Each structure stands twice: as structure tokens, then as C-alpha cells.
């Protein structure tokens, strides 16, 4: 996104002046190299790990277009909370009014309009999402740059937004109505969150159309609209009549039990008198080895070794094969578990099968632990 920003800015600032282009590129190159040299002690190791990451080296499908549902959700997602290929926008409704006012202004804000149109095109084409994500998979995590642009547009348009003329009010009102009708006609954008956001925008527009209100109070109206939009998004996200996201939360006590609970307790007791122990199983917690200090067969990190993912793929391990950075055991295969030097196998009492060659050892309230009769030492497999 930075490269696109610089290119567009150079075009608008320098035009066809080749000399200024050369000076600008040279100055930018020197500054970039200087910055990279200053950050090399951190940048180079991270770059090395990133380029050798399993997700970066794993072939991924690249579609020419997103699914239809993606495009159907986009209009509503501009002003309401939501996630669609990590296209998280959910801007406050005054941003929509500012964008409409910007495009109403002829021969003004050309650079901002260009940035907005380029960003909109990038959101609609999967290639840009994949390119911005290191060519690993389609994902619009770069959307924070678009959010920064929209915030800047609101700041630039604020003086005009609080001093709207009649023609501008009519234009924004008609455009807001068309936007609302389009969203209501599309199933994927039709929801209570959008109705609340548009209602806040309509009330704000009516308030800004009143003439005998000073500029300070108009600014306060916009601020209140931003706060109400954020509050409405939060209510629809967490309330029981909305997505009920808050119901997924647990108490601090339950969180501590999940993190330091029975899995850790059961395996830690058995590992007290052992120099090395590795365990596998079903229904286990990811990255529990960070807490227990005991090696396991479950892993879920952003950056992982590509050779491990290739080994799992070659062995046709079906569990989470589509996520090369997420390992879930060894498909409960006795041979692979033995080759991984796993001497213990844990099964959740809520469900799970025990592979061949394991005998019962102990249990607690949530897990049953089995001993591997065919365990191999760590050095045997390396």
C-alpha cells in the first residue's frame, strides 16, 4: 500500500517533471535503505523466517473473483461491524457522509478520490488481497490502510460537513437513501446493524441542515454520531438479540481452569521424574507446551517450518492439512505417533478413540492418559 501511495502522490505532485521524479525516487531510496540498515538486526531474521514459512511456500488457490456473498456483503460492511475475508471496515456513518460529499465536489480532492477508487478496486479483486498477504492466501488484512484513508477524508471534509449547503444536503440525502435501498435489497447486507447506522446518519444529516446552530455544536453533533455508531455496532455485536458475541466469553476462573487445567495437571504429574516426554492425543489445547514445558504434537503458530508441513502432506495426514501452520497430532496413527517419540496419549472424556498399542495409565475429570507400548527414543527418529 505504501508503494501505491507513493506512486500516486508522485504523479499528482510531479506530473511529467522527470527531474523531480528522479530526485524524489533517489531521496526515497536513500531514506529506505537507511531505515532498513537501522532495523536490519530485527528485519533480516524476520524476513528469513517469513520467506521460509510453511504458508509462504505452500501452493494456494487464487481466484479471479471472490464468491458472490463477498460482494453482496461489501456495501453494508462499510458502516457496520463484520468480517469478510478480513475486510473489516465498520466505519462510523459520518465517514460515509464525508465520502459522498467528497465525490460531490467537482475538481477538488482529486488525489483523495483516486486513492479511494484504487482502494475500492483492490478490495474487489482477490489478487491484491493475496499479494498484500505475502502471496500466501486471499486476505484483506491491509484494510487498516483504507481505514486510515477514510479517517483522513473525514478530517478533510469536516469543515464542509458542518457547513453544508442545500444542494449538498439534498445530494447526500438522496445518495444515502439509494445506499440504504441497495443494502435492503441484498440479503447479505440486510440487517439491524445497517438500519441503525443509516438512521444515525439520517438524523445527523437533518441536524446539520438546521441553520441556526453554530459550528461548535455541529462538530459536537458529528462527534456524538460517531460515538452512537460505535455504540450501536457494539450492541448488535454483543447483545442477545444480535450476534450474542458476549455469550462466548467465560469468567476469569474458567479461563484459568482452561489454561492451567486438567490436561496440564495430568501430564505434568507423569513427567516429574522423566528427562524427556512427548505426548499426543485428541481434543488437546494448542501450544500448551509453552505452559507445561512438555513437548506435544499440537502446534498453532503464525510462522512454522515448511518441511514439517511437507512431511504431514506427504503422509496424507488429514487433520488440518489445509492449514500448514496448524498441527493436530498425527491422525491417531500408531506408527507416526511412535516415530514422533510420543510416549503418552491423552483422550478427552467427551470423545475420542485410542490407537493400537496403547495401555491405560491414569485419568482425571476430563482426560484419560494412555502409555505407548511401542515408544521410540527421541534420538532414534532424528
Language-model features, listed with the residues they occupy:
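Perimembrane helix-loop-helix junctions
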Residues: 2-34, 200-209
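Short secondary-structure boundary/capping segments
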Residues: 2-5, 48-62, 133-136, 241-249, ...
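Short, well-ordered loop/turn and helix-capping segments at boundaries between secondary-structure elements
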Residues: 6-13, 43, 130, 151-155, ...
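Membrane-interfacial segments
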Residues: 11-16, 50, 54, 161-166, ...
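Periplasmic/ER-lumenal interhelical loops and adjacent helix-loop junctions
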Residues: 24-28, 32-115, 119-140, 144, ...
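C-terminal, active-site-flanking charged/polar segments
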Residues: 54, 58-61, 144, 148-154, ...
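Contiguous transmembrane helix-bundle modules in multi-pass membrane proteins
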Residues: 111-127, 131-259
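Soluble catalytic regions of membrane-associated enzymes that act on cell-envelope
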Residues: 221-382
Amino acid at each position: 500500500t505504501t508503494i501505491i501511495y507513493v506512486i500516486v502522490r508522485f504523479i499528482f505532485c510531479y506530473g511529467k517533471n522527470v527531474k523531480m521524479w528522479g530526485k524524489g525516487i533517489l531521496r526515497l531510496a536513500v531514506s529506505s535503505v537507511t531505515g532498513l540498515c537501522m532495523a536490519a538486526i530485527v528485519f533480516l531474521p524476520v524476513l528469513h523466517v517469513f520467506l521460509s514459512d510453511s504458508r509462504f511456500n505452500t501452493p494456494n488457490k487464487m481466484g479471479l473473483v471472490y464468491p458472490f456473498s463477498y460482494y453482496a456483503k461489501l456495501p453494508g460492511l462499510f458502516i457496520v461491524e463484520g468480517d469478510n475475508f478480513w475486510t473489516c471496515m465498520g466505519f462510523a456513518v459520518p465517514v460515509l457522509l464525508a465520502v459522498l460529499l467528497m465525490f460531490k465536489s467537482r475538481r477538488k480532492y482529486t488525489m483523495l478520490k483516486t486513492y479511494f477508487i484504487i482502494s475500492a478496486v483492490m478490495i474487489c479483486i482477490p489478487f491484491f488481497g493475496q499479494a498484500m498477504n505475502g502471496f500466501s492466501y486471499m486476505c484483506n488484512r491491509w484494510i487498516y490502510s483504507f481505514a486510515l484513508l477514510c479517517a483522513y477524508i473525514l478530517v478533510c471534509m469536516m469543515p464542509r460537513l458542518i457547513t453544508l449547503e442545500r444542494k449538498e444536503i439534498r445530494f447526500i440525502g438522496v445518495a444515502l437513501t439509494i445506499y440504504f435501498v441497495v443494502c435492503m435489497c441484498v440479503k447479505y447486507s440486510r440487517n439491524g446493524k445497517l438500519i441503525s447506522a443509516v438512521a444515525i446518519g439520517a438524523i445527523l444529516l437533518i441536524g446539520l441542515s438546521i441553520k441556526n446552530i453554530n459550528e461548535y455544536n455541529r462538530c459536537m453533533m458529528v462527534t456524538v454520531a460517531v460515538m452512537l455508531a460505535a455504540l450501536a455496532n457494539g450492541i448488535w455485536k454483543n447483545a442477545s438479540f444480535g450476534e450474542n458475541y458476549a455469550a462466548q466469553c467465560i469468567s476469569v476462573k474458567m479461563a484459568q481452569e482452561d489454561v492451567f487445567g486438567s490436561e496440564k495437571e495430568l501430564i505434568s504429574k507423569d513427567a516429574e521424574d522423566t528427562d524427556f516426554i512427548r505426548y499426543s492425543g485428541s481434543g488437546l489445547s494448542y501450544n500448551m507446551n509453552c505452559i507445561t514445558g512438555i513437548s506435544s504434537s499440537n502446534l498453532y503458530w503464525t510462522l512454522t517450518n515448511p518441511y514439517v508441513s511437507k512431511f504431514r502432506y506427504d503422509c496424507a495426514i488429514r487433520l488440518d492439512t489445509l492449514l500448514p501452520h496448524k498441527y493436530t497430532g498425527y491422525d491417531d496413527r500408531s506408527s507416526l505417533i511412535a516415530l514422533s517419540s510420543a510416549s503418552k496419549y491423552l483422550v478427552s472424556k467427551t470423545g475420542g478413540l485410542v490407537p493400537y498399542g496403547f495401555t491405560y495409565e491414569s485419568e482425571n475429570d476430563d482426560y484419560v492418559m494412555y502409555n505407548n507400548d511401542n515408544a521410540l527414543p527421541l534420538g532414534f527418529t532424528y
